[in-house]
């Protein structure tokens, strides 16, 4: 795989323990996780790095993860999004999938399964951006 040196992944979840757990998993896989406890904190951070992938909790207090994904897509941000949720509701799943997310998982799903989707999304995004660079 031909990745950039800094493989940042944002983890946006209002539960600190979930942020820590996902960050630990991502670090073990060679990623550099950056934690945000809300969508608002993510949007307000003007110094955030370029992220290879976003892991967004569906049901955040305030702006939801799905709404954050929609807002980013509306401004042309093509960063892959993986949604996680503690409450897997069919309507939320459909809404997330309609946003073109790379994956949708329950927080209790195996970490390796979620990580596999993150890896594929990052690789696909790299291939897509490499094919669109000027010669």
Label every PLM stretch briefly:
Residues 1-10, 16-23, 112-135:
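Non-catalytic signal-transmission and effector/linker regions of two-component phosphorelay proteins
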Residues 35, 60-63, 98:
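Residue-level signal for the "D+5" position in two-component response regulator receiver
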Residues 67, 88-103, 109:
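Alpha4 helix (beta4-alpha4-beta5 surface) of REC/receiver domains from two-component response regulators
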Residues 35-53:
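Acidic, metal-coordinating helix/loop segments flanking the phosphotransfer/catalytic sites
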Residues 37-38, 64-68:
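Acidic catalytic/metal-coordinating carboxylates
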Residues 44, 66-77:
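Short amphipathic alpha-helix used as the core "switch/output" element in two-component signaling
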Residues 19, 61, 89:
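The feature encodes the CheY-like receiver
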């Amino acid at each position: 795989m031909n990745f950039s040196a800094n493989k940042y992944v944002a983890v946006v979840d209002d539960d600190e323990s979930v942020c820590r757990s996902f960050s630990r998993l991502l670090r073990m896989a060679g990623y550099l996780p950056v934690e945000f406890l809300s969508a608002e904190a993510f949007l307000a951070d003007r110094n955030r790095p370029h992220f290879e992938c976003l892991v967004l909790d569906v049901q955040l207090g305030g702006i939801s993860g799905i709404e954050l994904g929609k807002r980013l897509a509306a401004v042309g941000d093509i960063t892959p999004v993986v949604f996680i949720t503690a409450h897997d509701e069919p309507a939320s799943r459909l809404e997330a999938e309609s946003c073109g997310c790379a994956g949708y998982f329950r927080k209790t799903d195996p970490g390796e399964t979620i990580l596999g989707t993150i890896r594929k999304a990052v690789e696909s995004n790299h291939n897509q951006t490499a094919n669109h660079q000027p010669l």
